[in-house]
Curated annotation (Swiss-Prot):
Protein name, per record: Methionine--tRNA ligase
Stored CDD domains: Anticodon_Ia_Met, MetRS_core, tRNA_bind_EcMetRS_like
InterPro entries reported for this sequence: Anticodon_Met, Met-tRNA-synth_bsu_C, Met-tRNA_ligase_1, Met-tRNA_synth, Methionyl/Leucyl_tRNA_Synth, MetRS_core, MetRS_Zn, NA-bd_OB-fold
BP terms from Gene Ontology: methionyl-tRNA aminoacylation
Subunit annotation: Homodimer.
Domain tRNA-binding: start-end pairs: 575-673
UniProt key word Ligase: yes
Residues the entry annotates as binding Zn(2+): C144, C147, C156, C160
């Protein structure tokens, strides 16, 4: 138990689409963490809400001929309902477009302005002459100036993953009509992020949570820290103080929502939000794709405005489906409601799978086959089998619960389990925590199998009674510690044990209180197996969705939409001759640490081996790249990506980064004409 009050938040789901499996990788671990620590006695408030601003929502509203607020409310309600169905119990689930967040955002910004951390600057901004409007964020597409991959607005989401400031994107085109964008002057406001470099380098080493978040942020700050444009020219959003035309950039008001939603909760429950945000710990659960927002932008903004920064940031790994990249456009996605809840599958099964499958920071590869295997082997065969065997034997052989004391060795085993599980939870090692819970059930399974009370019942009923009473104590402990993982199933088990209260009202320490009931409830199998037929039906849904997406893409006239406009700038043969293109062979490939999209390649170009850093890790594995022959620009000025020097550039086509390779085998270093 910790005496400090703690506010735990989860990254805000964006109200421009439905909830999918990737979302749950953040919310279920957050819910588990809160549930477990609360039942250890910690004072925790659990906060989330929906992110309602930004250009994608406006684009959707325009396409659907409705308002951004209406779009936001629709998806807000969807996420709220799905979270409740999945047993994710926030104390407050707010909206960033609600008045409390507008007020808190303006207040924080005004403080930053008053303290000299915000300045005005005229910049070159993309403008569509056909649509007659400036193109903030997702209204513009083009080329990333850092890695050369296709980028959208404020982020290179198909390449190096860098945040892009307004005006940085190269070869900009209007995302709405495809017209080549013009650059026009526009006044915007910048946050002096560069002024916080020393503060961040002092603060980040003290940040708790998962190492992937801390290390990624430190690398980012050490590499470069540019000032941050915090305004956009649009109507939808929080109005920037003193401006009629500008709103705040969505990544300004979105995290402020954590504070605003806590305010709303405090007002509704007669509590103090300052108790948690000023005096307590502040823990953020997020996806690894938004680390720099939460570990760089957010703490700098808070520090500048006089607020306390995050105490810990817990960043989950990404999700793949059957070994393939998660992709909504390609149909490689599992929708939480449509594919899971609407099929009648228990929320507890998915909660267990996502927590138990792998370490929180590692990539989680989802497959229905693995899902079936884990549920059947671990829940049905181990946990459920032990609980059912223990209680059924008591009812059939004794009727009432044997009135003998539980042996000391059983309490010692439970106590060891409780200590190990608590240590894992507080260290954000959720797989280890769930493994610890299952190990206690496995211990019980082994204990009852070795003791075989069904054989002893005739020759030594007292010994059989002792064994079964010991087993009931273990079942009770398992129910209590499994509740944060599987709330509904644990309540059912609790009632089978003869209890009538809510299991969530009991502290974890009750696992060491002797089992006191004299009778058991109605004992039934706790878990149902996932049969092959059901698993095959789920796999068929996924396969059909992927096939339908391919057909849809093939049926469209996609050429104009996908192919970028041909440049109007004319070059000469002399310009082309400046490029020294050579055939290279990749001799070594590895992922760049603390990144999700960068590969570090060692490429033999005939005369030497060079290091090239490329944003293709989401398309090619390091193993796929080794021995591959590629075309390399060898006279390109060296550049740095995430602190790694890149001495050359390879060629790739489209968002899928299809590599340009020689059709015939030619020696390394061969010049391309």
């Amino acid at each position: 138990m910790t005496n400090k009050p703690t506010v735990v938040t989860c990254g805000l789901p964006y109200t421009n689409g439905f909830c999918h499996l990737g979302h749950l990788r953040t919310y279920i671990p957050g819910d588990f963490y809160v549930r477990y620590l609360r039942r250890l006695g910690d004072d925790i408030v659990f906060i989330c809400g929906s992110d309602n601003h930004g250009t994608p929502i406006v684009v959707t509203a325009e396409a659907e001929k409705t308002t951004p607020r209406a779009v936001s409310e629709t998806y807000h309600a969807h996420f709220d309902n799905v979270f409740k169905s999945m047993g994710i119990a926030f104390d407050r689930f707010g909206m960033t477009d609600d008045p409390t967040n507008h007020h808190r955002t303006v207040s924080i910004l005004q403080t930053l302005i008053d303290r000299g951390y915000v300045y005005e600057q005229t910049i070159q901004q993309s403008y569509c002459p056909k649509c007659k409007r400036f193109l903030p964020d997702r209204y513009v597409e083009g080329t990333c100036p850092y890695c050369g991959k296709h980028a959208r607005g404020d982020e290179c989401d198909s390449g190096c993953g860098r945040h892009l400031e307004p005006g940085e994107i190269l070869d900009p085109v209007c995302a709405t009509c495809g017209t080549k964008a013009e650059l026009r002057e526009q006044k915007h406001y910048y946050f002096k992020l560069s002024s916080f470099r020393d503060y961040l380098l002092e603060y980040l080493p003290t940040l708790g949570g998962t190492l992937n978040a801390k290390n990624y942020a430190i690398g980012w700050v050490e590499n470069e820290l540019k000032d941050w444009c915090i305004t956009r020219m649009m109507d939808w959003g929080v109005k920037f103080p003193g401006s009629d035309d500008l709103v705040c950039y969505v990544w300004v008001d979105a995290p402020i929502g954590y504070i605003s939603f806590t305010e709303e909760w405090a007002k509704a429950t007669n509590n103090s939000w300052q108790k948690y945000w000023c005096e307590g710990d502040r823990v953020h659960f997020i996806g690894s794709d938004i680390i720099y927002h939460h570990c760089v932008f957010w703490p700098a903004m808070l520090h500048g405005a006089g607020y306390q920064p995050p105490t810990a940031v817990v960043a989950s790994g990404m999700v793949t489906i059957d070994g393939e990249k998660f992709s909504k456009s390609k149909g490689n996605v599992v929708w939480t409601k449509e594919d899971y809840l609407d099929k009648g599958l228990p929320a507890d099964y998915l909660r267990y799978y996502l927590l138990a499958y792998t370490s929180h920071t590692r990539e989680l590869d989802f497959s229905w086959k693995e899902f079936q295997a884990r549920i059947n082997n671990e829940l049905v065969n181990t946990f459920g089998n032990f609980a059912n065997r223990s209680m059924s034997l008591v009812k059939t052989k004794f009727g009432d619960v044997p009135q003998v004391p539980v042996e000391a060795e059983i309490f010692a085993e439970i106590e060891r389990s409780l200590a190990a599980i608590e240590e894992s939870v507080r260290a954000y090692e959720f797989k280890a925590a769930v493994d610890g819970i299952l190990l206690l059930a496995a211990y019980g399974n082994s204990y009852i199998s070795n003791a075989a009370p069904w054989k002893l019942i005739k020759e030594d009923p007292q010994a059989a009674a002792q064994i079964l009473k010991n087993c009931l104590q273990i079942v009770k402990a398992c129910a209590l510690i499994m509740q944060p993982v599987m709330p509904e199933s644990s309540q059912k088990l609790w009632e089978m044990l003869g209890y009538t209260d809510k299991i969530e009202s009991r502290p974890i320490s009750d696992a060491l209180v002797p089992f006191e009931n004299t009778t058991l409830g109605d004992v039934k199998p706790l878990f149902a197996r996932i049969e092959d037929k059901q698993r095959e039906e789920m796999e068929a849904v996924l396969t059909k969705r992927a096939e339908d997406s391919k057909k849809k893409a093939a049926g469209k006239n996609t050429m104009e939409a996908v192919i970028e406009p041909i440049s109007e700038e004319i070059i000469t043969i002399d310009d082309v001759a400046k490029l020294d293109l050579r055939v290279g062979r990749v001799v070594k490939a590895e992922r760049v640490p603390k990144t999700t999209k960068l590969l570090r390649l060692q490429v033999d170009i005939g005369t030497e081996v060079r290091q090239i850093v490329s944003g293709i890790a989401d398309v090619y594995t390091p193993e796929e790249m080794v021995d591959k022959k590629i075309i390399v620009v060898v006279n390109l000025k060296p550049a740095k990506f995430r602190g790694e020097e890149s001495n050359g550039m390879l060629f790739a086509a489209g968002e899928e980064a299809s590599l340009l390779v020689p059709l015939k085998d030619v020696p390394e270093g061969t010049k391309v004409h």
